[in-house]
Design a protein with these regions (language model features):
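Membrane-proximal, non-catalytic sensory/regulatory domains of signal-transducing membrane proteins
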Residues: 82-93, 117-167
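Extracellular/periplasmic ligand-binding regions of membrane signal-transduction receptors
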Residues: 41, 45-78, 107, 111-113
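Polar/charged heptad-repeat coiled-coil helices used as signal-transmission/dimerization stalks
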Residues: 4, 34, 38, 49, ...
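Extreme N-terminal signal-anchor transmembrane helix of membrane signaling/transducer proteins, especially
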Residues: 4-31, 193-203
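Short, hydrophobic beta-strand elements of compact beta-sandwich sensory domains
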Residues: 157-182, 253, 257
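N-terminal membrane-insertion alpha helix
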Residues: 18-42, 58-62, 183-187, 191, ...
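Helix-start (N-cap) segments at beta->loop->alpha junctions
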Residues: 148-152, 174-184, 190
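Extracytoplasmic/periplasmic sensory segments of membrane signal-transduction proteins
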Residues: 61-105, 125-128
Length: 259
């Protein structure tokens, strides 16, 4: 393996440090994205759980004879439909286990319709997937689907939490867009890489200037100066056959010993 030059020896740890910083930046960005996603998941779960608790309380009143069951169901559907999430943008859709929409506050036109054949922008059967989550052993879970943001044409990814409310065997679902998490992640990566590029360029310039100054003072690579010193110590003052000594700048160590 050929010996590294002084410049290479100075730049090698610099490159290593920059790569380590890049790896750390990527790791932190991935961690931040993961935590943001988990926080979004928990918020959706808490929101749907609160609706399920509300339904359970109303169902308990009906079971106690305080309300006729049909009136209790209508009350539960209406009150769940009034719940809001994420500053009013999020809501809960109530669906029967056979994919008939009881109440979708954002799209009341589909209330009462069987949506089993509905597909999202990516071709996924959303309501079938909701029913499958509700019918699972856990009775709840997360799913994703694609839907345009208000006023947008292109679909964006939404994270949803679905849960089967056992009081009247309804499926409840709430969703929130998560493309902002990915956008924030990409923006962080771009900013970090740009900052590291500037830092790397600055440090490389400093390393180059330091190396240039040291090489000018020595008159060449330290290995050449060491070879000259070894020859002098051995009594050889010819200095012939050594590469890198012919252009030693005036005032350098190598130029001085060549006189």
């Amino acid at each position: 393996m050929p010996a590294l030059s002084l410049r290479q020896k100075l730049l090698a740890p610099l490159v290593f440090c920059l790569l380590a910083l890049l790896a750390l930046t990527l790791f932190n960005a991935y961690q931040a994205r993961s935590k943001a996603y988990e926080a979004r998941q928990q918020a959706l779960r808490d929101f749907v759980d609160s609706a399920d608790s509300l339904i359970a309380a109303i169902a308990a009143e009906a079971k106690a004879g305080k309300l006729p069951e049909e009136d209790a169901k209508a009350t539960a559907i209406a009150r769940v439909g009034q719940l809001r999430y994420a500053g009013g943008a999020g809501y809960i859709t109530s669906i029967t286990t056979d994919s008939v929409v009881l109440n979708n506050p954002a799209s009341p036109g589909i209330n009462g319709k069987n949506m089993a054949g509905f597909q999202d922008a990516k071709g996924s059967y959303l309501y079938r997937n909701i029913a499958a989550v509700g019918a699972s052993a856990q009775g709840n879970g997360y799913l994703t689907y694609w839907w345009p943001r208000p006023g947008a044409k292109e679909p964006s990814e939404k994270l949803a939490y679905a849960k089967r409310s056992t009081s009247w065997n309804w499926d409840l679902i709430a969703g929130d867009y998560v493309d902002d998490i990915q956008q924030a992640f990409i923006a962080t990566i771009i900013k970090s890489v740009a900052a590291l590029a500037v830092l790397g360029a600055l440090l490389s310039l400093i390393a180059w200037m330091v190396t240039r100054s040291v090489l000018q003072a020595i008159g060449g690579e330290p290995a050449v100066a060491a070879a000259i010193a070894n020859r002098i110590a051995a009594g050889d003052l010819s200095q012939t056959g050594l590469e890198g000594t012919s252009h030693a700048p005036e005032g350098s160590v190598i130029a001085a010993v060549q006189r």
